[in-house]
A protein has these predicted regions:
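Cys-based phosphatases of the PTP/DUSP/CDC25 superfamily and their flanking regulatory architecture
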Residues: 1-132
Length: 132
């Protein structure tokens, strides 16, 4: 599988040695700038459509991604909106062994809102299970 090595996106990858595959990654629709005024460099996000029990890659049912960084938080929500994602499952703690593993991209309290991309995100149900 061909990785996205030629794109200058190092600041968008949580792990420099784990890249998205070109043929299955969502490509963010280009925009002149983000709502916060920052320019959009390219359509890259470290995520891939994956096979799942509901269908093949062609059906675009499941997206796997790295936990968003603080600087990719808006790109993450941009992908969610663009791809009409209806459920998000996070399988890591925000921090593990003192290191950030995922920027908190949702409001920490159910019912609260957090501005994201071109919308306000509201937490409906937050369930935390211990990770061993």
């Amino acid at each position: 599988m061909e990785e996205t090595k030629e794109i200058k996106i190092h600041s968008k990858d949580r792990y420099s040695d784990i890249k998205a595959y070109k043929h299955t990654r969502p490509i963010l629709v280009p925009r002149a700038s983000m709502p916060d005024g920052h320019p959009v460099a390219n359509g890259y996000i470290n995520a891939n459509f994956v096979d799942g029990p509901l269908g093949q890659i062609g059906d675009r049912k499941i997206i796997a991604s790295q936990g968003p960084l603080e600087n990719t938080f808006q790109d993450f929500w941009r992908m969610i909106a663009q791809e009409n994602v209806t459920l998000i499952v996070t399988t890591c703690n925000l921090t593990e062994k003192g290191r950030s593993k995922c920027h908190q991209f949702w409001p920490p309290v159910e019912g609260n809102q957090k501005p994201a991309w071109e919308a306000a995100i509201q937490s409906v149900n937050i369930s935390v299970e211990p990770i061993d």
